[in-house]
């Protein structure tokens, strides 16, 4: 590991805090249906995927994708729990953000856990998301949360056939 100066270490801490703030801004904007603020969280050439399937590209494409998905949603709460970040070249970072979701989807209360696998870039004076892949650990009907979590197919989005977790248990 390369030794860092005090100034570099301080900058790293400030960058980590800025990326944490970015993720909270994204969650609050999404929950508040503020697609302008959602778009500002991303780089101009960003991509957003779900389990590896690209849903939106570019700021406006991502905002449109999320707005379209939210047409079938009621109240939502995204709650981040942790962020683990690695810094590469100047202005580049990658990370994993763990979160729980409470969503009303198609009139059904759902609960689950996800991880966002992200790439970040410093652009326009701020850290922004350059790539985000939402990977689902489990999600299902709130009333059946324990049953869904213990299932071999714990990814149970309403209206979609149950799937295995993006993070299956290793045996």
Language-model segment annotations:
Residues 108-109, 121:
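Short aromatic-glycine motifs in intrinsically disordered, low-complexity regions
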Residues 140-171:
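Acidic/histidine-enriched, glycine/proline-rich intrinsically disordered or flexible terminal extensions
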Residues 6, 48, 71, 98-108, ...:
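Extracellular/periplasmic carbohydrate-active domains that bind, remodel
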Residues 30, 42, 99-101, 133-136:
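Short beta-strand segments enriched in hydrophobic/aromatic residues
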Residues 92-94, 115-147:
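Short beta-strand edge/turn micro-motifs at domain boundaries
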Residues 1-32, 36, 40:
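Short, low-complexity N-terminal intrinsically disordered segments enriched in polar/charged residues
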Residues 35-105:
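A solvent-exposed, acidic/Ser-Thr-rich amphipathic alpha-helical stretch
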Residues 78-80, 110-117:
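Short, surface-exposed coil-to-beta transition loops
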């Amino acid at each position: 590991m390369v030794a860092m100066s005090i100034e570099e270490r301080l900058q790293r801490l400030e960058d980590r805090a800025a990326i944490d703030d970015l993720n909270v801004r994204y969650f609050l904007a999404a929950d508040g249906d503020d697609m302008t603020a959602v778009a500002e969280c991303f780089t101009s050439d960003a991509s957003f995927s779900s389990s590896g399937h690209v849903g939106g590209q570019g700021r406006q494409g991502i905002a449109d994708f999320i707005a379209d998905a939210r047409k079938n949603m009621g109240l939502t709460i995204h709650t981040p729990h942790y962020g683990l970040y690695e810094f590469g070249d100047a202005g580049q970072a990658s990370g994993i953000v763990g979160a729980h979701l409470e969503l009303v989807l198609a009139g059904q209360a759902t609960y689950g856990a996800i991880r966002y696998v992200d790439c970040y870039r410093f652009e326009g004076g701020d850290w922004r998301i350059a790539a985000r892949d939402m990977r689902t650990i489990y999600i299902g009907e709130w009333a059946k949360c324990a049953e869904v979590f213990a299932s071999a197919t714990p990814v149970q989005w309403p209206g979609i056939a149950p799937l295995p977790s993006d993070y299956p248990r290793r045996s």
